[in-house]
Amino acid sequence: MPQPPLPTLVRDLVRLVVTVMDEIRPRLLQAALSGERSESRNHRHADNFLSQHDLWMHERYRELLSKIIPSYVYASEEADPQIIGDDPDPDLCVLVDPLDTSELAVRALYGYTHVLVYSRQLARPIAAVVGDIFHHVQIYLAARDTTGGEHAFALTRDGTPHPLHLTRTVPLSQALVTNYLMKPAERFHPLTQQTRLLQELGQLSPEGGRRGRLGVDFGSVGLCHIAAGFTDAMIEFAKGFAIWDLAPGHYILNAANGVVLDLQGQPIPLDYRFDTVTDIGKAMNQRRTFIAASSLPLAETILHTLQKT
């Protein structure tokens, strides 16, 4: 069955994100090879690495977004929400994480960039693009079409689209479960305390091998990897993700028929309560724990193994 064409907005967003990635990639490679990481003091998020590249991308996104969206609320990780354009109360809010995993991006290892467009009138996202700066699978996207249906795709560097729609489930003992475990005290140590989860992942399969795996993943792209079928689940139970880390991947995974639950087992809604600019600012200061998975049975199984920390 043919799918409706993607809306102009998301096609424009894809071109915009690819442009920004093409511009920043050589700068990041030069930073990695030279060792000049251009780190800046992070006044907004003291525990997070911040480079001049993050700030440059923040400004570049604002410049380019203003060419395709006349009026919007610009909600970037790197600044307070700001109204752009002539409309004093625009419908659209554009949520941006200019450079996710920047401490690895300046080492030319991993780097991602997130854009989500949210309709305050509809109280839900209408488009999201997650870009992978260094890999061949370059873009993950989701968009709402004119009929109200939602579709998710991955695009390779040559522009080939791959529809994303999850229909399978795997038992936890055969799943690849990821977690952002890079920070030893805040994230890795709490993960080591999840003994039931680790035991379930280490169970023997019917064929006799141990097929469960635990991996590392990052921000929204971790949920996109589930949407594409590359991984099976992602968990965040320690510190929680900020909305710019979670929301774009949440929308893409939801459009691909995946699930995102809170730690009480309830689906996390796509209504982010962006009713006013003040509300957007409040949402930017909150964090959410979650279980994201390719299927509800897998998410619920993981939930039952997690121990309160």
Residue ranges and their predicted role:
Residues 90-129:
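Glycine-rich active-site/cofactor-binding loop and its immediate structural neighborhood
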Residues 113-223, 277-309:
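Acidic beta-strand-loop-alpha-helix segment within the catalytic core
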Residues 1-34, 194-196, 203-309:
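Oxyanion/phosphate-interacting regions
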Residues 1-99, 303-308:
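N-terminal subdomain of lithium-sensitive/metallo-dependent phosphomonoesterases centered on the IMPase/IPPase/PAP
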Residues 24, 54, 65, 142, ...:
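Residue-level signal for inorganic ion chemistry
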Residues 73-77, 105, 212-217:
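General beta-strand structural signal in soluble alpha/beta enzymes
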Residues 73, 127, 232-233:
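Short, Asp-centered acidic motifs that coordinate Mg2+ and/or phosphate
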